[in-house]
Amino acid sequence: MPNNRYFVLYKPFGILSQFSGVEDTLKFVSDFPPEVYPVGRLDKDSEGLLLITDDKWLNHHLLNPRFGHQRTYYVQVEGTPTAQAMQQLRDGVTIKVDGKKYFTKPTIARI
């Protein structure tokens, strides 16, 4: 059985959740072994808990939608979201990533 390594890191605002790149990446936060990688990602303009590991099985089971792992996000917005905006989140919304449109799954959204 392999001796996998697991690290938990609070990713600060302004840092990319990746190890490659010239600046503003996880390699500037701590000196991690070269074989580990983040499970999932957080955008540069977000902060939060990030699991870093070399366990490919765990990574697959946590990220593959087939396994249905629930995620919780806390967000800060300007103003108070309307009832209509909250319902749109609950129903799923269309987003664009790198020019490609995606429809998000329905979610639990509350204030």
Write out the residue ranges for each language-model feature.
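RNA pseudouridine synthases
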Residues: 1-111
